Regions:
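Active-site beta->alpha N-cap acidic-glycine motif
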Residues: 1-82, 175
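C-terminal domain-boundary segment and adjacent tail
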Residues: 9-15, 26-29, 161-187
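Structured helix-beta-strand junction loops
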Residues: 14, 40-41, 114, 148-149, ...
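Structural recognition of the beta-strand scaffold that forms the well-ordered cores
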Residues: 18-22, 43-48, 83-87, 117-122, ...
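Alpha-helical scaffold elements lining the catalytic groove of polysaccharide deacetylases
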Residues: 52-78, 93-151, 164-167
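Proline-centered helix-kink/hinge sites
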Residues: 87-88, 170
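Short, internal active-site loops enriched in acidic
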Residues: 89-93, 160
Length: 187
């Protein structure tokens, strides 16, 4: 979305590289944004083709098709061998149980067989919740769980409705830099 452009601008101004877990969008604007991410040194990683839980987790063949689809899309678009992935709903989700997958380890085994490493977040700004948080509240949601030391993967979204996430980003960056944190992407 246009929010992605603003996020990329903020990251560039702060000389920060990030990881973007991609949902397949094959329109020209989305492809240009994904190429910009990659060209500016960010890690482009797999998320899902559809983000529709009933489709992704219908059964193991459907899950494999989703993973293969997003991998092929990223690999072919960027000319890379994408090896990083984030589960729709996270790897500890129980959403898959409502559909055809009985054990998330079946999915993990498939990723392992493809040489794909999955990542989860350990802090969220809570922008995926139904509540509409202000930019300051989103930043506070992150800062509440940041300790004095540690490695954190912060979950934030760039969908069109996530304007407050964009507006919270500089607050989060400034606060974490003041605490001595550095930023890096998954590599």
């Amino acid at each position: 979305s246009a929010n992605t452009d603003e996020i990329l601008d903020i990251l560039k101004e702060n000389n920060i590289k990030a990881t973007f877990f991609i949902i397949k969008r094959d329109d020209p604007e989305s492809i240009a944004r994904m190429k910009r991410m990659y060209d500016e040194g960010h890690t482009v990683a797999m998320h899902t083709v559809s983000h529709e839980y009933p489709l992704v987790y219908a059964d193991l063949p459907a899950y494999k098709e989703d993973v293969d689809g997003i991998k092929t899309f990223i690999d072919d678009t960027l000319g890379i061998d994408c090896k990083f992935y984030r589960f729709p709903g996270g790897s500890s989700n129980t959403i898959y149980k409502h559909y055809g997958i009985s054990d998330i380890h079946e999915c993990i085994d498939y990723l392992d067989s493809r040489g794909i490493k999955y990542f989860d977040w350990n802090i969220s700004n809570s922008d995926s919740e139904n509540k509409k948080y202000s930019p300051a509240e989103l930043a506070a949601n992150v800062e509440e769980y940041i300790g004095d030391t540690g490695v954190y993967n912060v979950l934030q979204h760039d969908a069109p409705a996530k304007k407050n996430t964009v507006q919270s980003l500089q607050i989060i960056i400034d606060d974490l830099k003041a605490k001595g944190y550095t930023f890096c992407q998954i590599t």
